[in-house]
Amino acid sequence: MYTYLMKFEWNSGKNEKLKKERNISFEQIIFHLSEGDLWKIADHPNQNDYPGQKIYFVIVDGYIYLVPFIVDDDYIFLKTIIPSRKATKDYTQENGD
């Protein structure tokens, strides 16, 4: 299992691409996680292709971003950041916002 003391890692090239294309970064995601802006964590729905991978559902300015990740012994590796209109709708309905 992982703890809040574990460090986060990611691909720096992917981070730069996300900043340019989606106006979001792994640093922003980590900030929001540290602030408790986490709706839920789920197993990746396609465990055949992504075994052991999980997904953070992170709340950023009222919008849900899906952040697939892998837990290693020493760190959590963040794979990408995906804005999700469907998850945002589900979150809003569930929380009455």
Please describe what each predicted stretch is.
Residues 1-97:
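Ribonuclease/tRNase effector modules and their secretory precursors
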